[in-house]
Amino acid sequence: MRNGTVITEFILLGFPVIQGLQTPLFIAIFLTYILTLAGNGLIIATVWAEPRLQIPMYFFLCNLSFLEIWYTTTVIPKLLGTFVVARTVICMSCCLLQAFFHFFVGTTEFLILTIMSFDRYLTICNPLHHPTIMTSKLCLQLALSSWVVGFTIVFCQTMLLIQLPFCGNNVISHFYCDVGPSLKAACIDTSILELLGVIATILVIPGSLLFNMISYIYILSAILRIPSATGHQKTFSTCASHLTVVSLLYGAVLFMYLRPTAHSSFKINKVVSVLNTILTPLLNPFIYTIRNKEVKGALRKAMTCPKTGHAK
């Protein structure tokens, strides 16, 4: 599109260098998406169906699983479209809406993970006070606050983005409407908006990462004070899954977004985005359940109850 022409739509390039692999990639990503929905949905259903799992840790895990379902759903359907048609077009309002929900859910996810770290800290470092501090009311307030803060931060950024006139190149070298590539189509200088975006990113990502690190420093200190090696292993196993998810998510996102994105190369970012958008939400249910005896026991109970009832 010529410069000076007002843009009403964007063209998503997706992965143009993988000609001939569209069909197998479509099938692989579609199956991954279905497994992600099923895995995270099963976590939510299991927690709500099993009274023993209705404690703060699993309440926040349900929030995380719901966010993972929503996070992948904001991107994967359009990504699949790039494998089907040669020219994937998305209208301006749809593009901005996709960007809003994608970053809103992603921001909220960081905040929920931070609350989960705090819950792990209380469980291990202050086990006697944990039940009186992490009440159902406080859990609900913390989760709701995460959603509200995530919404507010991204909504303010989106409102600024909507005000921009777009008249440059409307081709986005990505598989979804990322903010960085979209800014390259703006008719005016976007340095201030980029700076505000970096500030918001620093507040959310490194800010929450610092809180997570402090929580785990206290947790590891408490674990090291346990006299027996068996106690070390048993206590650490209760937070190992959460630490794994935190490492995966923060590692990918810190690499992608802690730069002024409008002037960066997005080729490597696209690969990391695929891992962050597709694989991490798929792996989370397995990471949280593979060493969790309570969840595995609840799943086993859910699968065997119908058979028992039928035998009677």
UniProtKB/Swiss-Prot annotation:
Give a GO molecular function annotation for the protein: olfactory receptor activity
Q: Pfam families of this UniProt entry?
A: 7tm_4
**The organism's place on the tree of life at top rank:** Eukaryota
Topology: which residues are Extracellular? 1-23, 74-97, 159-195, 257-269
DNA repair listed as a keyword: no
| InterPro entries, alphabetized | GPCR_Rhodpsn (IPR000276), GPCR_Rhodpsn_7TM (IPR017452), Olfact_rcpt (IPR000725), Olfact_rcpt_6C-like (IPR047132)
The residue ranges for the Cytoplasmic side of the membrane come to 45-52, 119-137, 216-235, 291-312
Q: How does it sit in the membrane?
A: Multi-pass membrane protein
Residue ranges annotated as transmembrane are 24-44, 53-73, 98-118, 138-158, 196-215, 236-256, 270-290
Q: Where in the cell is it found?
A: Cell membrane
**Disulfide bonding pattern of the chain:** C95-C187
- Keywords in alphabetical order, please: Cell membrane, Disulfide bond, G-protein coupled receptor, Glycoprotein, Membrane, Olfaction, Receptor, Sensory transduction, Transducer, Transmembrane, Transmembrane helix
Give the CC-aspect GO terms. Answer: plasma membrane
The protein's role, per its UniProt record: Odorant receptor.
Its family? Belongs to the G-protein coupled receptor 1 family.
Protein known as? Olfactory receptor 6X1
Q: Record the organism.
A: Homo sapiens (Human)
Q: Encoded by which gene?
A: OR6X1
